[in-house]
């Protein structure tokens, strides 16, 4: 098994797939960095007769197989939790992941669907922190300066961002009045929930997705 990391760069990922194709590998598993920009990788692999499997994220072009979770549903569950905790009324902020990546697109759709069902909930602001804890902390600090006590909840499209937002709120002395909810159920987030700091996170079986992708490649 040969593993490479595109670091969020769709163009770099395409180059990596092209390298694997030139090496005549037996199969390729890809976690697409973006839905559209990574679609050519699917076309190139198929043209070379090499099976390509998408793991965790989709592309516009259909791969030979896809293994992943329902990102829309995970966001719906998270935002429904927020709505219930706020009694269907309040101001929410949303931190996005990497723009154009399936998880970002679908989690946005799921969250917006629930907000549409709760007309007394207002989306104060939404920006990307690119799945990153440090970027999320900086963004949350800016939001605290901009919105202050208007903030009732923050929905972060992954746990890394949720933990960054949490740190900013704690340092500003604002956490007691603001819900922080993420997605993925990473170890740090689960511990934070157990410790009564972060409010909730949605489970995503990353290990199961990876195992499923390997099994699909062997088939």
Predicted regions and their residues:
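A residue-level marker of the well-folded mature domains of exported/periplasmic proteins
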Residues: 1-219
